[in-house]
Amino acid sequence: MTIIRKKHPLIKIINHSFIDLPAPSNISSWWNFGSLLGLCLIIQILTGLFLAMHYTSDTTTAFSSVAHICRDVNYGWLIRYMHANGASMFFICLFLHVGRGVYYGSYNMIETWNMGIVLLFAVMATAFMGYVLPWGQMSFWGATVITNLLSAIPYIGTTLVEWIWGGFSVDKATLTRFFAFHFILPFIITALVLVHLLFLHETGSNNPTGLNSDADKIPFHPYYTVKDFLGVLILLMAFMILTLFFPDILGDPDNYTPANPLNTPPHIKPEWYFLFAYAILRSIPNKLGGVLALILSILILALMPLLHTSKQRALTFRPITQTMYWILVADLLILTWIGGQPVEYPFIIIGQTASIAYFAIIVIFMPIAGMIENNILDLD
């Protein structure tokens, strides 16, 4: 078996990636989220595939087909709620995975990091299009508002929006193409994940100290396969508790009302995992400025390697930057809360303050904190 594992052209790729892979001996549970994201992707593809067997991407029947899945298809309710809440679990793992990367300075592996940012955009695009498919009120109005943002692009904006819509409003053509893209994107994401792993295995994993771990490596299997399996069990337990006991807690009640272009919901808002970006978008009174801030709120992650001023890689031994980091986390939670609130006093000013703080902490305060720590430790 050892010979096959190491010699067979296909099996040896798996061997070098998941069995004989040299891994740092001290990586903590924060390194579990990569495998958990892989699990989330598999769950989403499988549940999505079974949903697609019963779903119809037509404006007249889309809402009814989702109701039919929940009422008449064997375990259709379970598949539908696993898919909807699977997206939430996916984003929880994504945010923790990115947060880990920022905390431990994993962004210094530039190719892996940039590939991760591309993956983040791809997953966000997929989730947005998936939210449109049930064709409820929030699906329709969310699609209208977000696609309309592209009209802020000078000169080509309006043409671009109508091209994406396939008409003069969000309608049948829009729903059909969103379904097509929502179906294909997860497979593209799977391919991108392999590239992400390819880049990671070029450098090897980072570790909680931020130091080079070449002198102290252990094989991935059995140590981290067992550790990942524990993470999988915990994730699945949390996931099934959410799905079976609180399936609608993260959804919007408006989406149980069929889409009606003549009736606007009082508060149009996206799913919870987009609220922080939505709050940043809304905090700028100018449409184009808002769109740029929205894109930059994610794209700023690509600047992380350039903004790294410290001589140390991780934040493990850097209390000043640690403080900045946790203020940033709190700020993101505030933005998430504000994104779900109506546009009125005092939420407008809180959102604007939190948006400025978000960019200021990343671009100004964390780099300055890094330099201060260098001086304290005399690391010139």
From Swiss-Prot:
Its cofactor is heme b. Heme b b562 binds at H83, H182. It comes from Microtus canicaudus (Gray-tailed vole). This is Cytochrome b. Heme b b566 binds at H97, H196. Component of the ubiquinol-cytochrome c reductase complex (complex III or cytochrome b-c1 complex) that is part of the mitochondrial respiratory chain. The b-c1 complex mediates electron transfer from ubiquinol to cytochrome c. Contributes to the generation of a proton gradient across the mitochondrial membrane that is then used for ATP synthesis. Its main location: mitochondrion. Binds 2 heme b groups non-covalently. The keyword Transport applies. One of its GO terms (molecular function) is metal ion binding. The cytochrome bc1 complex contains 11 subunits: 3 respiratory subunits (MT-CYB, CYC1 and UQCRFS1), 2 core proteins (UQCRC1 and UQCRC2) and 6 low-molecular weight proteins (UQCRH/QCR6, UQCRB/QCR7, UQCRQ/QCR8, UQCR10/QCR9, UQCR11/QCR10 and a cleavage product of UQCRFS1). This cytochrome bc1 complex then forms a dimer. The chain crosses the membrane at residues 33-53, 77-98, 113-133, 178-198, 226-246, 288-308, 320-340, 347-367. It is found in: Mitochondrion inner membrane. A ubiquinone binds at H201. Belongs to the cytochrome b family. Pfam families: Cytochrom_B_C (PF00032), Cytochrome_B (PF00033). It comes from the Eukaryota.
